[in-house]
């Protein structure tokens, strides 16, 4: 569904052409670039074509044994599916986990499923009793140098032009191993699986997030750096809300970017004094989930598909991945910090429903989406 074109260019936003990152657009293949170091794209500021290139290269690479991916929503003329079909025709073992209960996309997903099955792709229709909402791709290599992509959003070209989403591309063995185990869990539902790196629901995600918050409380009590920064769509899970209140009651600083539903109330004496929440509504739908914990000065960062809602943490297969690369961690921090100081499109989320504009101490105007786009443009010129 797209907004109709009324022929009024003066009512449209100026064009922001997605940046094709120089480091991902040279003669070196995407698979080799990812093997060298972790990579990322932040759509729609960056071009989604980088991910499509991964699939297109994997489809013809003789070292690729198999490709597994989850699909939740698909574009009408999906290059993602076309690349997967090409891979199957080239003899790769391709497995697609597609969610037939993706709201508003049921008919489209059924149609694509038939086309993929006709091409020889193994199609799995989710897990009984759970909705598969994770956004992961796993590419198995004959050499053992496997590759994984973990995204906060759908592998959907249309969404990638309108939703802000983050994608991590990695060859780190501990992470790729865990991603392969997620597919094992989906293929053999409810089998016992232990994940070393990933936070996976409904297995242990809520417990692991709770432990991360507990560490911030301990560090605050020990006089170490302690804070929590989260960018998310919704926070309504009672357990996670109580954990944030508990951390705040111990003096842990908590800064949140929440676009949608939020059960937290800020400024309650002794309960949520140290919590502040900003919400951004702008030209792009804020959709990425980013989690940052001070960890005593050695920050831990994560990205993934899960909001803090009961349905995500208890009734869906969701994946949150750690981020270790210093460059990517710096960018994640920038994204959250820019959002927290957005005075033009940001609004105070305080439980009153007033949606008061966010006003900085120095009263300067700052629009986070525009500033991020400018940053990525300039960064690309510098690295050219």
Cite the ranges covered by each PLM segment.
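N-terminal localization/anchoring segments of enzymes in phospholipid and broader phosphate metabolism
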Residues: 1-228, 246-250, 262-384
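Cofactor-pocket helix-loop regions in the catalytic cores of large enzyme subunits
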Residues: 233
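Glycine/threonine-rich ATP-lid/beta-loop region of ATP-binding domains
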Residues: 238-241, 245
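Hydrophobic alpha/beta core scaffold segments
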Residues: 253-257
């Amino acid at each position: 569904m797209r907004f109709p074109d009324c022929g009024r260019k003066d009512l449209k936003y100026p064009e922001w052409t997605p940046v094709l990152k120089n480091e991902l657009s040279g003669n070196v293949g995407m698979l080799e670039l990812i093997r060298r170091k972790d990579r990322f794209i932040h759509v729609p500021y960056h071009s989604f074509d980088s991910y499509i290139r991964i699939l297109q290269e994997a489809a013809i690479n003789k070292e690729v044994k198999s490709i597994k991916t989850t699909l939740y929503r698909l574009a009408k003329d999906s290059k993602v599916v076309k690349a997967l079909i090409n891979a199957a025709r080239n003899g790769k073992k391709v497995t697609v986990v597609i969610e037939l209960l993706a709201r508003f996309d049921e008919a489209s997903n059924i149609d694509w499923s038939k086309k993929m099955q006709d091409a020889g792709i193994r199609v799995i229709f989710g897990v009984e009793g759970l909705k598969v909402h994770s956004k992961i791709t796993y590419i198995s290599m004959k050499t053992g140098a496997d590759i994984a992509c973990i995204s906060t959003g759908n592998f959907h070209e249309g969404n990638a032009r309108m939703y802000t989403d983050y994608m991590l591309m990695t060859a780190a063995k501990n992470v790729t191993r865990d991603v392969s185990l997620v597919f094992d869990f989906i293929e053999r539902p409810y089998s016992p699986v232990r994940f070393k790196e990933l936070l996976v629901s409904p297995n242990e995600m809520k417990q692991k997030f709770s432990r991360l918050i507990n560490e911030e409380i301990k560090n605050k009590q020990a006089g170490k750096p302690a804070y929590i920064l989260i960018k998310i769509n919704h926070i309504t899970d009672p357990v996670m809300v109580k954990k944030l209140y508990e951390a705040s009651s111990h003096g842990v600083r908590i800064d949140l970017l929440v676009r949608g539903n939020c059960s937290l109330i800020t400024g309650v004496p002794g309960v949520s004094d140290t919590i502040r929440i900003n919400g951004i509504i702008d030209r792009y739908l804020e959709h990425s989930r980013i989690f940052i914990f001070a960890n005593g000065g050695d920050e831990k960062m994560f990205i993934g598909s899960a909001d803090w809602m009961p349905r995500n943490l208890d009734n869906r297969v969701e994946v949150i991945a750690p981020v270790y690369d210093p460059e990517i961690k710096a960018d994640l921090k920038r994204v959250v910090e820019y959002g927290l100081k957005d005075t033009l499109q940001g609004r105070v989320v305080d439980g009153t429903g007033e949606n008061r504009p966010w006003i900085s101490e120095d009263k300067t105007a700052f629009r986070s989406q525009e500033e991020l786009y400018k940053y990525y443009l300039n960064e690309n010129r510098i690295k050219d």
